[in-house]
A protein has these predicted regions:
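Non-catalytic, membrane-anchoring transmembrane segments at the edges
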Residues: 1-152, 166, 170, 242-251, ...
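Hydrophobic alpha-helical membrane-embedded segments
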Residues: 4-8, 107-123, 210-214, 254-276
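Membrane-interfacial catalytic/cofactor-binding modules of polytopic membrane enzymes
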Residues: 154-205, 210, 226-344, 373-407
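Core alpha-helical transmembrane segments of integral membrane proteins
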Residues: 212-215, 219-228
Length: 407
């Protein structure tokens, strides 16, 4: 495998030469500030945050009914997702990268504020009438307020225990929004101090991996795309397979670089800067023998949010565990489709359908394939899975943009 990959690298260098140019990306980003509506949309998102805080304060003071508060919350949350879509659709000057960034930020704010509203509702229902000692005995309340068992070792480092409704402050909500978690709780575990060396190592990793990621695109992906200059929707099946195989290896490298750069370097950098104690962002997904284990351990932050605010409520409503898991997977597939198809303005459902195909594949793996064979199948699904299908979108977007320029 090492020899094969080395051969492919040298073959690429001999064929195309050295194409890596970090300055090109910076020059493109700074070329025209008027094409940055995404930056303004991210700033505007603060309005939704302030509205969410005001709703919770009003509910805690009994200034509005729960029904009215819930209605306003849903309108506010819906606006977080819909307004950037409408603005980006009208203002065509925004770049695809900028659009993807703003939709990612707004979707993260949506999930965080949904968790914020839900937890505060639980606290209003169970904490206030019972008091501290009685509430601590209630199942589910402890994890909402003090965190889960994995974080209890950091308890002594929490500066001050906050109780409801003293948590409804600007400082509290913005700490939660900036922290590397999607699930709200009043008292987050904290480390005792900021480790400067650890922070600098993570910063160096982030800078290095960003340049490596961009270099792979310039050196490996763009030449292959330019060579075909035909969108996948117009290709024959044999050409599609050939093109995907050419992109599979660089795409997989890019996925691994992105994973390490984001889930390890970036999230740990943010956590260290904020003294955030719960650092379990992923587990050993590379040892996965089933797709279920892979999806639940490669992104623990999102998995926790889905389990807490989607899966468990569905099970409590009477749905089976399998139905709950399937719904979570459908939600995840729609989320990935939203983040990719909307910025590129290409609604083809490729990512959604590919991820939905993994539902029966996950069932087959869990029933009939285990051990090393199961791990091998999981890796094949990773290499030829959603990441590669996402690349199909980007490939077609690039081809269509080149056609517009040359028209």
């Amino acid at each position: 495998m090492i020899l094969t990959h080395t051969h492919m690298v040298f073959e690429n260098l001999i064929t195309y030469g050295i194409l890596v140019d970090p300055v090109q990306i910076i020059a493109f980003a700074l070329s025209d500030p008027n094409t940055w509506p995404s930056s303004y949309l991210i700033i505007v998102s603060n309005i939704f945050i302030i509205i969410a805080l005001h709703i919770e304060r009003s509910l805690s003071a009994l200034a509005m009914s729960e029904k009215m508060g819930y209605t306003i919350q849903m309108i506010n949350l819906g606006a977080i997702l819909l307004i950037p879509l409408i603005v980006l659709k009208v203002l065509t000057t925004s770049t695809a990268v900028g659009s993807a960034m703003v939709l990612t930020v707004h979707s993260i704010i949506f999930m965080k504020l949904y968790s914020y509203h839900e937890v505060n509702r639980w606290l209003r229902e169970e904490w206030a009438p019972l008091g501290l000692k009685s509430a601590m005995k209630q199942p589910g309340i402890t994890s909402c307020v003090f965190g889960n068992d994995e974080s209890n070792s950091y308890w002594n480092n929490i500066d001050q225990v906050i109780t409801y409704p003293d948590n409804l402050t600007i400082r509290d909500i913005y700490y939660f929004l900036l922290a590397p978690t999607l699930c709200y709780q009043m008292n987050f575990p904290k480390s005792s101090k900021v480790r400067i060396r650890f922070l600098l190592r993570r910063l160096f990793e982030m800078i290095f991996l960003i340049h490596l990621f961009v270099g792979l695109i310039q050196q490996w992906v763009l030449p292959v795309t330019r060579k075909s200059m035909m969108p996948f929707v117009e290709m024959k099946l044999t050409i599609i397979i050939h093109q995907l195989l050419l992109l599979a290896i660089p795409n997989h490298f890019m996925w691994l670089i992105f994973f390490h750069g984001f889930f390890h370097s970036t999230l740990n950098f943010i956590a260290e800067l904020m003294r955030f104690g719960d650092r379990r962002f992923y587990r050993d997904w590379w040892n996965s023998e089933t797709l279920t284990y892979f999806w639940s351990n490669s992104n623990i932050i999102f998995h926790k949010w889905c389990m807490r605010h989607v899966y468990r409520p569905l099970v409590e409503m009477g749905y089976s565990k399998w139905e709950g898991q399937t719904f979570v997977f459908v939600l995840s597939a729609l989320y990935h489709e939203y983040l990719l198809a909307a910025p590129l303005n290409m609604f083809r459902l490729w990512v959604f359908l590919e991820m939905m195909l993994q539902v029966p594949m996950a069932w087959i793996l869990s029933k009939y394939v285990r051990g090393l064979y199961g791990n091998a199948v999981v890796w094949i699904c990773i290499i030829l899975g959603p990441a590669l299908v996402m690349h199909m979108y980007i490939h077609d977007y690039y081809v269509f943009q080149e056609r517009k320029v040359n028209a």
